[in-house]
Amino acid sequence: MSAATAKYGILVGVDGSAQSNAAVAWAAREAVMRQLPITLLHIVAPVVVGWPVGQLYANMTEWQKDNAQQVIEQAREALTNSLGESKPPQVHTELVFSNVVPTLIDASQQAWLMVVGSQGMGALGRLLLGSISTALLHHARCPVAIIHSGNGATPDSDAPVLVGIDGSPASEAATALAFDEASRRRVDLVALHAWTDLGMFPVLGMDWREREKREAEVLAERLAGWQEQYPDVRVHRSLVCDKPARWLLEHSEQAQLVVVGSHGRGGFSGMLLGSVSSAVAHSVRIPVIVVRPS
């Protein structure tokens, strides 16, 4: 979905945790940078009881509503504090009483980007947001940004954007977004192509030098069109014969943002980047955007 037609613009799942507030702050800066509306969405799982409880049920429901309003207000405050005098075009808030994961996945169909904290407390403290973010990585219909508390780069950071490239459709979509992010942030782009998931061990019968030459050509071809479209972005290529997740984690220590595809192939056909994206999203300490193919 294009940014212009996305109802929610940048959609942030909020729950009152420190990670949630960090997600709001990051999303707010992204909304200002892109001039997109931002929507703060808090979902409360309905109270489920196995027997009539009368006033107890009513009290619990009322407590949920009061607590939910506090979460929304806290998210608004986090947004305001993160921006200073800057403001996104529009700020919307939504409070929904429903099951958390299905509601977020459904809402993602109308968002340009969904942003969530890496971990936090779900409805009534029963559901870790870590499990929610994992579900979104696999099922959301838009790119998903995973934000860790207190470890994101500062808004004026000159650290590069890091993108993982493997040649899959999801990787191509990730490359497009990574170039755009680097251009808007006015920073360099590091393009990492790790072309095997077997580790740095020789395989009998394979000409590794010839394979490396071919993989370097593939990486150059994948980047050529985007470098023409974004001549302002300086690109650093990194080609390694090793596991993608390992090198993405290592390179992320000098980056401000990591962008990867949701699914693709690893070094060989059939090795899904899905496992790589999940590992990176939950291990890297900087913001990670996981992109689905268009």
Swiss-Prot record:
Q: Where does ATP 2 bind?
A: G164, D197, G261, S262, H263, G264, R265, G266, G267, S275, V276, S277
Q: Give one Pfam family, short name only.
A: Usp
The keyword Cytoplasm appears for this protein:
no
* Gene ablation phenotype (knockout): No visible phenotype under normal or hypoxic and normoxic stationary phase growth.
The record's misc note reads: Was identified as a high-confidence drug target.
Q: Give the family, as the similarity comment puts it.
A: Belongs to the universal stress protein A family.
Q: Report the protein name in the record.
A: Universal stress protein Rv2026c
Q: Which organism is it from?
A: Mycobacterium tuberculosis (strain ATCC 25618 / H37Rv)
